């Protein structure tokens, strides 16, 4: 292609991006942020809704979706060796039954001892179907992977698993190499040490010019804190990083475990914070374009206040169903590491 044509093409692309960017506000107003808080807040702690059948194992990171009138949860379990991924089911969001493992330890692979999975392409519409979308006739699940034994030990990266069925407790297929890892040549300053939890959504509006968007928390070799960054894809297999900086960071402690929902035309990111003030707690941010996020500066959505979450109250999955907001989170306290629930209405009162 002649040099002049290349320059003209690049200019056209830049102009297209600028025109697209002008369609959306990059900052969400304080009034709107307060309205969102009023919509999503869950002041009533229901308590523990799920313990792993083996109480000696630690559970974490719920992802909840629905199929054929039944609710399902993927969650991860740490047994002293590493993470594996399990599935549970419920008819009412309050009582859960474990179904079995879907990502297990393996041998001689990059992810042999760590497979912490998070279901991809869950419907993000607030009060929506919460169904999981198929792409190329497969269901997809990103996961934290690594081959070192221990709690989030060694070099961790993001893998992608897939399966033809969604709700059966069968082993999912995994790729032989990670899709993102901290040693990648294009790894950014805030992620070149370790990459942790990820979440993948379909961006129907293509705000980034790509249909699939991933958010993940990561730590850098000099940035010794966790921030949330972005990556994009056209096919769920090949991913490229998006932007030069994290979309959410406090430059200390942890910002992590993002979940994205869409309330009308506004995107809401639930995430947890830790150690940039005491404890671990649930927060949120808002965006009109999935790229520019306004962080909430008010009170926590969830914080430690009971025996069951006295140590940590963190790692959100939030849905609205039949007029009630359900905020699932990982509670760490006197009952161990379990899944707890807070709601917008008091479900304990009959």
Map each language-model feature to its residues:
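Beta-rich carbohydrate-recognition and catalytic domains
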Residues: 13-117, 121-197, 201-256, 261-311, ...
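Extracellular glycan/ECM-engagement signal in secreted proteins
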Residues: 316
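Bacterial Sec-dependent N-terminal signal peptides
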Residues: 1-15
């Amino acid at each position: 292609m002649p040099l002049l044509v290349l320059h003209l093409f690049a200019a056209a692309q830049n102009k297209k991006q600028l025109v697209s960017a002008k369609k959306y506000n990059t900052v969400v107003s304080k009034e709107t942020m307060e309205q969102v808080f009023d919509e999503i807040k869950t002041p009533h702690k229901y308590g523990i809704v799920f313990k792993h059948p083996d109480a000696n194992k630690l559970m974490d990171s719920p992802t909840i979706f629905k199929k054929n009138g039944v609710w399902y949860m993927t969650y991860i379990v740490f047994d002293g060796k590493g993470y594996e991924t399990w599935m549970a089911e419920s008819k009412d969001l309050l009582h859960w039954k474990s179904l079995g493992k879907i990502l297990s330890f393996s041998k001689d692979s990059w992810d042999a001892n760590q497979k912490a999975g998070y279901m991809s392409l869950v419907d993000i519409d607030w009060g929506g179907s919460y169904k999981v979308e198929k792409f190329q006739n497969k269901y997809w699940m990103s996961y934290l992977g690594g081959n070192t034994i221990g709690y989030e030990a060694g070099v961790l990266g993001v893998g992608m698993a897939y399966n033809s069925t969604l709700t059966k407790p069968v082993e999912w297929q995994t790729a032989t190499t990670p899709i993102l890892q901290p040693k990648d040549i294009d790894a950014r300053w805030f992620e070149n040490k370790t990459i942790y939890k990820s979440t993948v959504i379909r961006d129907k509006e293509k705000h980034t010019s790509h249909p699939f968007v991933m958010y993940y928390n990561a730590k850098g070799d000099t940035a010794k804190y966790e921030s949330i960054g972005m990556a994009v894809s056209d096919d769920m297999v090949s991913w490229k990083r998006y932007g030069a900086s994290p979309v959410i960071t406090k430059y200390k402690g942890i910002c992590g475990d993002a979940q994205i929902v869409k309330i009308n035309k506004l995107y809401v990111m639930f995430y947890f914070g830790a150690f940039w003030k005491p404890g671990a707690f649930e927060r949120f941010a808002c965006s009109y374009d999935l790229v520019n996020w306004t962080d909430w500066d008010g009170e926590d959505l969830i914080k430690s206040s009971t025996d069951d979450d006295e140590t940590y109250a963190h790692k959100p999955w939030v849905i609205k169903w039949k007029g009630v907001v359900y905020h699932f989170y990982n509670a760490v306290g006197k009952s161990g590491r379990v899944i707890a629930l807070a709601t917008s209405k008091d479900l304990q009162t009959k």
